[in-house]
Amino acid sequence: MIQAQSYLNVADNSGAKKIMCIRVLGGSQRKYAAIGDVIIGVVKDSVPNMSLKKSEVVRAVVVRTCKGIRRENGMTIRFDDNAAVVINKDGNPKGTRVFGPVARELRDRNFTKIVSLAPEVL
């Protein structure tokens, strides 16, 4: 459950290390984002000499949350951290690698490029 002012780790090699959510997309009164939702965030920490700099506004898709998501078969998936992958306007990731596991629900949300780059899909 990601809301405004939430910090997320960046799970790709786009250059950002941490982003802070400033808006959850998908409606004017939408408060929370879950796995597969698109957010707008600001880069709070970045790697030197990379394309994304501190204080840049970016779009990102949430790939891991500490809040568990419940599946149809009753299973709950929960991760150790909140993480996102930086995307462009078309929904393609800015980085070329994705670190750590991602949830299978991303495939249902048409983020197949992120799923194919991930080392593990849970």
UniProtKB/Swiss-Prot annotation:
Function as written in the Swiss-Prot or TrEMBL entry: Binds to 23S rRNA.
Localization per Swiss-Prot or TrEMBL: Plastid, Chloroplast
Quaternary context? Part of the 50S ribosomal subunit.
Q: Which is a Pfam family this sequence falls into?
A: Ribosomal_L14
GO MF, one example: large ribosomal subunit rRNA binding
One GO CC annotation: chloroplast
Keyword annotations from UniProtKB, A to Z: Chloroplast, Plastid, Ribonucleoprotein, Ribosomal protein, RNA-binding, rRNA-binding
Q: Which family does it belong to?
A: Belongs to the universal ribosomal protein uL14 family.
Q: What's this protein's name?
A: Large ribosomal subunit protein uL14c
Which GO biological process categories is it annotated with? translation
Origin species, per record, is Mesostigma viride (Green alga)
Q: Which CDD domains match?
A: Ribosomal_uL14 (cd00337)
Q: Which NCBIfam families match?
A: rplN_bact
